[in-house]
Structure formats: C-alpha cells, structure tokens
C-alpha cells in the first residue's frame, strides 16, 4: 500500500501523550501524567500475570469515534468519542493543548442506555467548556453531520499500585481497532498496550514504576494513540511522514534555569518520541531514522550545554543515547550515502562494484530503539520534564544567570568553530569531524537561545551557519563513501576506480568546506551581544 499523509493533525497534536491537561467532569482543571507502552506479543502473558499479582478490575470498553464526512475534527486535531465503560456510556472530547505536551479533555457521563444501544453523539453536551466551545466552532463550518469513523473493542485490566509516595493506575488494554475505508473494506489493527497514569503523589514514583515495568517486560514507549491508529486505518495509511524539529517557541524567553532546561528537553522529545515510536513499531523509513538521529543530537546538545542551568540531569543518560545514535548511523551510511555515491559513480562511467548488500543489514533500527537501556533513558527524560524543581538547597540559575550561561557557551563554541575553520585543511580526520559536530552543537544551542536574545539577529546568524553545515555534511558523506568502497577492494578490485574517484572528490569537498568556514568570521555576526533580549 503506498505512503499517504494522514489528512489530520493528530500526528503532531499527540506527539507526547505522557503529559495531558484534562478538564474533569466537574469542570475542574488538573494535570494528568501518563506513560503508554507497547507490549511485544511474546511478553503479554508475563505482563498479565504480573498485573494479577494485585487486586485487578476487568472492564470491556467499546468506543465509537465520530467525525464529519470530510474529517473536520481530525483536521483540527480533535477527537469526539462515545465509549461504553461497563454498563455506562461516556462521551468524551479531546483536543490539542497549547503545546505538544498538552491535551484538553472533557467527559460527560451518560449512564446506562435503554436497550443497550449507543446514544447519539451530541456536541452540545460539552458547551461551556473551553474544549467544548472549540468543538462547536469547528463543527459550525463542517461539511456534514457526524458519523462513525472507526471503533475500538478493548478488554481493560486495571490495578492500582503505590510507588515512592505515588498512587499509580496500571491499565492493560487488549483488543482491536476497526475502520471501514472509502472502498468499504474492513481494516483492523490489534491493541496490546500498558498505560501507567499518576493518580496522585510524586511524579518520580510514577517514573520509577514505569522504569521497572518497561525494563522487566521489554516494553517500549509509544506516542501513537488509539485515535491516531484509527485514522490511519480509515485512510489506509501504512506509513506516516517523519517528524522534524519545530521552531523553538518565543516562550523560552525569560525562563529560569530549571524551566529552560525542561523546555529544551521537551522540545527535543517532541521530535524524538514520534519518530522513535514508528521505528520501534517496525518502520524502516529512512527519513524517520534520519530525523530521529537529528533529534538525538539536539537532545545531547541540550544535556551537555544546559546541564549547569539546574541540577537533575544524569550523566548516565549519555551512553545509551550515543549507542542508538551510532547504530542508526550505520543504517544511514548504507541507505543514503552509498546510494548517492553509486549514482555519482554511475554518471562517471565507473564499473559496477559488489558492495556486499548483506553487510550490516542485520542491524535492525527497531531493535536499537526498543533496547531496554534506551527506553530507560526516554522514560527518565519524560519524567524529568514533568518533575517540579528540586529542593531549595539546590536551586537552578535564575533567568539572568541562565541567559549569561548561554551567552558564554555560545561565545566559546563560536570562537572554536572560527579558529578551526581557519586551519581546517591542516587538521587530521578526527579533528575535522569534531569541527562538524561542534558546528552542529553551535547551531542547536543557538536555536534554543534565540528567544532569549535577539530572535531576528539569531535567524540571520543561523542562516549564515547553514552553508557551512551543508558543506561539512557533504565532506563527511564523501569520507563515509570512500571508507565503504575502500573496504570492498579486497572482495572486488573494481572498487579501486571508486576509491580514486572519491578521493579526488573528497579533497575538493574539503577545500570547499574550508572556504565556507572562513566566511563565517565576516558573515556570522553573534546575536548574543548586548543587553537587549529582543530586536
């Protein structure tokens, strides 16, 4: 089935479902924190047995999701659902909140229905609530009446547990999602998930419990909701576009050290988590792998350069992030770099070379992402983003000192890039590679810091960095391709042509990189100078 983009905003609106803002039935406002994990089929029996070691409650949940014929609600990133919970029907509306970590939700308990039939969906039931008024506004200009889009039939096993001063509800969901496509064909997908929701208490207790269950049973974190899976079934979508990094929001300006550190990490996770979810579930899409690697590099920059803003970052997080980044890079080198090199060599009338296509193909990106060590870091980072500041004895930097710290970091990286750019041709291969990595760090840190200084000047600065990063990227790709062909010389002597040809291209790419790097001294004007925070 061909790739199709989902004609909805659910993919972006539900990037990080671990944090949710919910309006309860009494219209009260509360913060809900939850983790959702996918369960490998071979581990389901063990998970269910572990659930049953305490008092459990079994509930059958039959839900009907409705929308207009043109998908007005899905396009607005909203969900309207009728769900039978035991003997009672509940109507729920959900919508994206102010950011990728938030969601509005309002529930109306309709009670048992005569005859057991599902009640009709009525958007007016949510009138007078923020999300309800938004629902009515979307439907006001809709293209037709509400009708069922897809349905779920879930057996839920729930259990409450105590962990580190927290009360957590565990919900094991097993069942199916069903949707009829435009051609009338019935499409189904299995559901096998474990959700952990903080009912009350310290979020660190939830994180510890999520760590324990995910590590013990080989679970992996997923951002893909049942609603999004239903939309995919409805539209026959089997692959979704990779998620790129969103622009850093102006709200970063004025944040103290702890809040800025949390915001930057959350911004990185908003790119990492949806791509990691797809790859862990079996996607081999090269762009998803590529964007996941970009997100990991941005995250490592945040962890390294924002560490001094506030306590709480664990140095042990670095190693699993580096390992997954490296393993995914092996795939990229063969999938992208080799394809580009082969196309260029073919144009140059090079003889075909047996590149041993079976080499490294055993490296499964999904297995790398599902690795317990990597999943443990994701859970810890999600928990860090939801945790309140630490004790008063270890406060983070205030907004002024946080801004000063970023300015010092930017100044240092900027000077290092300029210094090494002047002598790029004299550096060895490892040092040249460090220049490329340092330039990326400078770019990502500049993106995080832009709202704190002069955003327009920062945009100009970043635009000046881009040609240098592109040039160093080409230089690196030439080096990778050269190494791949050099490694094949023993198996196929025809690779010598490629080695010589690529060696010449690599030298030319290095000269171009030095020229572009030297231009930065005059072109890339630091935006962090001066006291003004804005243009």
Residue ranges, per PLM feature:
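Residue-level detector of intrinsically disordered terminal segments
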Residues: 8, 20-22, 30
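Basic polycationic patches enriched in arginine
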Residues: 3-4, 19-25
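Function-determining surface determinants
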Residues: 26-535
């Amino acid at each position: 089935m061909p790739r199709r983009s989902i004609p909805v905003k659910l993919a972006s609106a539900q990037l990080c479902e671990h944090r949710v803002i919910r309006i309860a039935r009494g219209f009260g406002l509360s913060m809900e924190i939850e983790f959702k994990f996918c369960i490998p089929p071979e581990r389901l029996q063990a998970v269910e047995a572990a659930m049953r070691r305490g008092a459990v409650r079994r509930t059958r949940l039959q839900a009907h999701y409705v929308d207009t014929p043109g998908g007005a609600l899905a396009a607005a990133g909203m969900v309207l659902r009728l769900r039978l919970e035991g003997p009672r029907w509940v109507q729920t509306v959900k919508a994206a909140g102010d950011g990728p970590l938030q969601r509005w939700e309002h529930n109306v308990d309709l009670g048992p229905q005569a005859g057991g039939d599902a009640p009709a969906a009525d958007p007016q039931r949510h009138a007078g609530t923020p999300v309800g008024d938004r629902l009515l506004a979307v439907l006001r200009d809709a293209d037709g009446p509400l009708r069922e889009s897809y349905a779920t039939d879930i057996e839920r096993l729930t259990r409450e547990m105590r962990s580190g001063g927290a009360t957590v509800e565990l919900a094991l969901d097993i069942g199916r999602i069903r949707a009829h496509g435009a051609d009338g064909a019935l499409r189904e997908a299995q559901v096998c998930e474990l959700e952990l929701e903080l009912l009350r208490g310290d979020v660190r207790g939830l994180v510890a419990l999520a760590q324990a269950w995910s590590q013990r049973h080989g679970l992996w974190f997923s951002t893909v909701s049942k609603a999004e899976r239903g939309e995919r079934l409805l539209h026959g979508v089997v692959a979704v576009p990779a998620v790129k990094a969103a622009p850093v929001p102006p709200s970063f300006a004025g944040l103290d050290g702890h809040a800025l550190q949390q915001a930057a990490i959350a911004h990185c996770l908003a790119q990492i988590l949806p791509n990691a979810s797809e790859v862990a579930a079996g996607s081999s899409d090269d762009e998803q792998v590529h964007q996941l690697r970009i997100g990991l590099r941005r995250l490592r920059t945040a962890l390294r350069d924002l560490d001094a803003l506030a306590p709480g970052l664990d140095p042990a997080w670095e190693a699993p992030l580096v390992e997954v980044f490296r393993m995914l890079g092996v795939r990229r080198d063969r999938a992208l770099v080799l394809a580009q090199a082969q196309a260029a060599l073919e144009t140059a009338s090079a003889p075909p070379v047996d590149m041993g296509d079976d080499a490294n193909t055993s490296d499964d990106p999904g297995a790398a992402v599902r690795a317990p060590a990597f999943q443990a870091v994701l859970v810890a980072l999600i928990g860090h983003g939801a945790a309140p500041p630490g004790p008063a004895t270890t406060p983070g930097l205030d907004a002024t000192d946080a801004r000063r710290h970023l300015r010092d970091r930017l100044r240092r990286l900027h000077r290092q890039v300029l210094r090494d750019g002047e002598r790029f041709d004299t550096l060895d291969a490892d040092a040249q590679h460090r220049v490329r990595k340092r330039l990326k760090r400078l770019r990502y840190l500049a993106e995080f810091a832009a709202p704190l200084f002069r955003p327009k000047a920062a945009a100009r600065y970043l635009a000046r960095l881009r040609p240098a990063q592109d040039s160093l990227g080409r230089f690196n790709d030439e080096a990778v391709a050269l190494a791949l062909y050099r490694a094949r010389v023993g198996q196929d002597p025809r690779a010598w042509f490629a080695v010589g040809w690529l060696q010449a291209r690599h030298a030319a790419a290095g000269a171009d990189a030095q020229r572009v790097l030297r231009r930065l001294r005059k072109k890339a004007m630091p935006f962090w100078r001066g006291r003004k925070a804005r243009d």
